[in-house]
């Protein structure tokens, strides 16, 4: 009888250890999945910082320079008579 009780106790302890191990594995897998999602979000933010923001800045700055060149730096267009005189 004592031997049977010891086997039952070992069985229950083994079941508890198995349940704890399964819970730990599930917890590790869930934490790894959430960490990978967080990493993806951080990489998207990094992509925004390194690629999107500078390209928007370059686009806006080049548009400003284009307007500045057309309004202030570029000489006025020549009339047809002036072109003929310059070619002669």
UniProtKB/Swiss-Prot annotation:
Localization in the cell: Host Golgi apparatus membrane
Give TM segment ranges.
Answer: 17-37
InterPro entries recorded: E_protein_bCoV, E_protein_CoV
What are the UniProt keywords, alphabetically? Answer: Apoptosis, Host Golgi apparatus, Host membrane, Membrane, Transmembrane, Transmembrane helix
Topology in the lipid bilayer:
Single-pass type III membrane protein
Q: Which residues lie on this side of the membrane: Virion surface?
A: 1-16
Primary site of residence: host cell
Q: Which Gene Ontology cellular component terms are annotated?
A: host cell Golgi membrane; membrane
Which GO BP terms apply?
disruption of cellular anatomical structure in another organism; viral budding from Golgi membrane
The record ties this protein, via Pfam families, to: CoV_E
Q: Which residues lie on this side of the membrane: Intravirion?
A: 38-79
Write down the superkingdom of origin: Viruses
In the record, the note on similarity to other proteins reads: Belongs to the betacoronaviruses E protein family.
Q: Output the HAMAP family linked to this UniProt entry.
A: BETA_CORONA_E
- Please describe what this protein does: Plays a central role in virus morphogenesis and assembly. Acts as a viroporin and self-assembles in host membranes forming pentameric protein-lipid pores that allow ion transport. Also plays a role in the induction of apoptosis.
Q: How does it assemble?
A: Homopentamer. Interacts with membrane protein M in the budding compartment of the host cell, which is located between endoplasmic reticulum and the Golgi complex. Interacts with Nucleoprotein.
Q: Any idea what this protein is called?
A: Envelope small membrane protein
The record lists the organism as: Rat coronavirus (strain 681) (RCV-SDAV)
């Amino acid at each position: 009888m004592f031997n049977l009780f010891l086997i039952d106790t070992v069985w229950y302890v083994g079941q508890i250890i198995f349940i704890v191990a399964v819970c730990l594995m599930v917890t590790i897998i869930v934490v790894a999945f959430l960490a990978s999602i967080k990493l993806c979000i951080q990489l998207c933010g990094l992509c925004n910082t390194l690629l999107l923001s500078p390209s928007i800045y370059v686009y806006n700055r080049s548009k400003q320079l284009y307007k500045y060149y057309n309004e202030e730096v570029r000489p006025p267009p020549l009339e047809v008579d002036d072109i003929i005189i310059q070619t002669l």
